[in-house]
Amino acid sequence: MDPFTQHMLEKAEQRSRALGISNASKFPLVECSVPSSSATSASGGDAGVLAPRSRSPGGQSAASGGGKVVTLGKATLEASPAKPLRHYTAVNKENLDMGIEINITTDKPIGVQVEIQEQEVTDDEEQAEGGALNPLLEAEPVNQPLARLRDTSRSRLQRMGALYSNTDDLSSPIHRTEGQFHVTTGEEEDCGNRSSRQPKQRLGKLAALADTINQWEDDTSHHEVHRLLEAPPPKPHLSSRRAEKGPAPLPPKKDEVDEASRTKQLKWDPKVLSSLEAQGFQRRESSTIKHTYDYAKQEEAAPASKVEDAVLTAKPPVPQKSTTVSQVAKNFASSAPAPKPAPAPAVSVKSGLVSGRAALFENKGTGGQSQGLRNQKDPCELSLKERMKLFETGNNKAMLPMAPIGSAPSITQIRAEEVKQHLAAMHPVTAAAATTVVAATKPKQENKLRDKVAALVANAQSSAETRIKDIDRQRQEDMQIISNRFNKQKELFDNQPSDSSVAAQARPPAPAPSRVVRPMPPPPPPPIAALSPGLASSKRRSPGDAPTTDEDSKRARKSHSDRLYPALSDLDSSGDNCCAAETASATDDSHQQDEEETESCMDESDDQSQTEDSSAGMCNGSLGREIMSAVQRNEVEMQQQQTGKKTVRYADQDMYYDDSSLNSSQVSAGIDDYLDEALVEDYGSTQDDQSDSGDEQNASRLSLGSKGTTASNSFSFRKNPASICTPIEEHHEMEMDLQTPLLSGAQPVKSELSVNQDNDNLVTLVHTVSFYRRQQSANSSNSTPVRKICREQQVMRSALAGDCHAKHRLEYDSPQQSDYVAAATDIADQTDEDDEEMQNAREVNDASQAQDKIKKLLSEVCKQQQVIGQASQALNLCAATVEFSGSTESVEGERYLLLATHRRQACLDEVQRLRVENSIRPVGAPKEKGLLTVKDITIPLRQEYVRKMASNNINGHHLVCLLKYNEHVLATKTVPTMPGLLSVKFPDVLQLNNVYADFRITLEIYGMLAQRDQLPHELKYHINLNKKGGIKTPKKKGGENRLVMPPVQSPAGPHVVRTPQLVQYGFAIFSLREIQRTTWTLTQVLGVSPLEGVVHMKVNCELSVSVEYKGFLTMFEDISGFGAWHRRWCYLNGSVINYWKYPDDEKRKTPMGSIDLNSCTSQKVTTAPRDICARLNTMLLECERPALETDQESLIIVPNGRTTTVRHLLSADTKEEREEWCAYLNKALTLLRAWGTTH
């Protein structure tokens, strides 16, 4: 053997020891195990093969389970220098005279000593050595010549491949699933210590360093930390394992197991035990300690004896809960020794050996295949991604559900799986520890299983009976509604038998006494499918169906194991299957159902509501046939009484509910088409087809988001060429409901079916069930009127009352038209959703701004109240003195009091509006603000008043003007009327900022009578001009009060709040449309007024924010009849577009030309028509000006009599620039038309 191979074998041996794998070279194969006596009588040549393979330089010992001890002792032996002995020890010592002596000792007084001396290794001996190293070698008794005929290189490579393999069957170094956790005895440890203390020569240090590095590579101290899933069972006190141990000993032979033989006390590491128990391993009492895994698989009958003792792989499936775990824990915790059972005749496979792993791998081909299938989860429990992963991983077969999708599995199926899990978990434990015989007959197990299932069903009867009573009561109420609906038709057209006779006529035969008897309505057939073979033969069944209990009759049958989707024959046609399907759908996809439907567990009321809505569901019983005959006689009149549908779309989820008048003619017209087609169908008996169609009509109500599918044997629909069929996406439900209803041309046809010749000519569906469901749900709208609730942007009722978009209005159309309207609404659904989110954000922002504004207004109200108080005090003072009574100071005080009073009231009105509307601006109001200026207010006076003023008959009036806009109130100065003046002119200029384009401003005129000043100014304020200088010394007595107080004061005191004495003479209201006027008519308030009744003023409105945009445009110019394009730098500012040749010329030169948008007649700036200009990205602006004599018609000049239209062609460089220019130009035109020309 070359040094490289020798080094690799030694390293592999060290790796196996560090990983806790038993030394497979010392283990014979289990199927070829021989008694120990045959091993002791081995020949010298065989022993010589084993001798150099000893790992330790010193003697080593290994202990077996039966108490046999094999001792390898060292003996000196002379060797000639010409033939050096080959050493395969850890330390390679050269030219060392050494021999090997093997002492084999057993508990019996028998000892055999074999001496092996040095000899030349021949090819035959090398082959024998390779046979000893190969773990997969079928080691027959030692004298068998096959052991020496193996190929040396193949055996070594196989062993190295087994140790370095990364297969799933190989034991994990962390989990330590090997069963050989034996501890070396003190003698072996002492022997190992003696060998380690021997001095090492030459390469000793290097070998020690290499061994340390190898230990680094195979360090197993970093174990995974597993959290305990459940409390570990009580375990006996076991001493921890020793850190240093020798190689695993030889396993015991089953022929040598003796009750009198002693087994060494095993020492376990508590961490290892807790880790194993957390992974699902269980403790058991047996002659050889093994760890079994709690599998939830059904054990096969044939390989049961082999799998019973086999150690499972390191990657087991997820353990399931078993009822035998606590029992095993109790048995293991009991310290009383249990009698050991007789060993099974089957050969056990030892763990840790490659041969054992190969045996497990071979077993997978037979029984393991069926067990692997049972380990899979039900597809209905998986998510969409997990089911997609099934097809991506390349498995041969898809997982199949326990029951058809949309229905829950029956109680027998669930309990059968649990019982199988119990048997699978109990099997490896009871086979080795229990004293009873494991091989029991299968009928007895089935009897026990039936007893358990019966007990479980009996416990559930109490709760099921209450549900059944509620279901029956709901069924009776629903069927009463259906019968009343058609009774009205019978009374109108024909005298038909009463519903009571019909119901009595259609009542099914009484069920057998073994079943639970309860009253059943006619449409769903009673669940008597499993009573008699005669009745069962008329129903389509899956091949493996068996008679079931009452609870099981509500479940759909399990589909075939070779198909992913169920076939037509897999579903039972009993009416209760529909209920079970609805139960599964309501629990899985509750967001797609009504809240009332999802509140109950069994949801029978939902089933009946669907039966009411479904036309096919009404035909299940004899009542359905009676209805059929009634609606066929009145077919012509019922088709004429079609009612429209109301389409409103504003829901958050794309859910569809039924709503409109439950007109029987509308329902009957759709039922008639279904029934006529159903009578022509040749699926078999009419009753079977009606039952199946009822099942599928109920199943068609399953939500689109359901992950499962069920078989469909009802109708599929062939659309007209004009209609469009778009599949409904499950997640982003942007469906196009363009399917024409059945009344408008689409006719039901046979379902497209395919016959599976390989599986008993079984009829299967071409498409998935979801495809047929979508077709049914789209075309069953005529059976019951449907109200489609669609998501729509929330708009205020005030906007709905006005002229809104078509999609904001309620439309009452025919079913076909409403489908197209709904489809058009679906297209803009995503946009509406985004608009709704943006509008919600704007509403929240407006609400917060409104609250902030309310706070500011309330603070302004407080300020104005203070002004009112101060003005009232001033007026009280003026009224209390003779000097200031009726003076100009009192008039100014009246003005301040008037202004503060109106400002306070305006703020309170605005606060009230904000609290009601909760927004600063109403929805749809313009956002542009401007500056409003009012000046030169002139009020003409009446001629009679002017004459009286000239004759000094009256004293005149004081006038003041108030300009009011929302919470803003402005006031002019008080101006008196003077003799000889025909009008009163106010010199003030009033400006209102942040005025919106929809403003309505009120101009109010107030006045009061004037009084002549009785005292001059000096006397009024007691100004003494005749005194020379001031008094040197003050007077002894206080200065006399020269202000004469009137004898009568205000009864409320000097601090009372006064009402303004200024009264309103008239008012005028103007808006943006009247700003070009200069004269407004006043609305007179009082009968006697000095005003003539009109007011003259100048009003100017200016946009506070002007539109500005700059960029290059290529402009078309007509030069002597020829067109030319010139590139210009254009600048839009307000209502004028100026252009230069270069951008730098904008600040230095005057514009080369300009375009005034005030004269633009284009309603909207868009792309120029191709008959005028075919250049890309060209905009057209048409302006109008007075006609000139030199105007000649051309491409850009169009004479129109007195006016001439001038076309401006402006070409942008890119499409984006053209769109930006169009947006800014249109905005400028809109503002100009709203605010008018700036003055």
Swiss-Prot record:
Residues 594-610 have a biased composition (Acidic residues). Keywords: Actin-binding, Cell cycle, Cell division, Cell projection, Cilium, Coiled coil, Cytoplasm, Cytoskeleton, Developmental protein, Differentiation, Flagellum, Meiosis, Mitosis, Nucleus, Oogenesis, Phosphoprotein, Spermatogenesis. Its main location: nucleus. Residues 1106-1230 form the PH domain. Residues 252-265, 551-563 have a biased composition (Basic and acidic residues). The modification Phosphothreonine is found at T740, T831. Residues 126-371 are annotated as: Interaction with and bundling of F-actin. Residues 32-67, 230-265, 493-621, 684-716 are annotated as: Disordered. Changing T1114I: In allele scra5. Strong maternal effect allele; abrogates cellularization of syncytial embryos. Accumulates in the ring canals that interconnect cells of the germline cysts in males and the ovarian follicles in females. These structures develop from arrested contractile rings after a specialized cytokinesis in which the closing of the invaginating plasma membrane is incomplete. Also concentrates in the arrested cleavage furrows that initially link the oocyte to its 15 nurse cells in the early egg chamber and is subsequently lost from these furrows as germline cell division is completed. Residues 519-528 have a biased composition (Pro residues). Residues 53-63, 500-518 have a biased composition (Low complexity). Required for cytokinesis. Essential for the structural integrity of the cleavage furrow and for completion of cleavage furrow ingression and proper formation of the midbody. Required during cellularization of syncytial embryos for the proper formation and function of the furrow canals, the stable inward folds of the plasma membrane which separate the peripheral nuclei. Also required for the formation of the pole cells, the progenitors of the adult germline which are formed by cytokinesis of the cytoplasmic buds at the posterior pole of the syncytial embryo. Essential for embryonic viability. Interacts with and bundles F-actin. This is Anillin. It comes from Drosophila melanogaster.
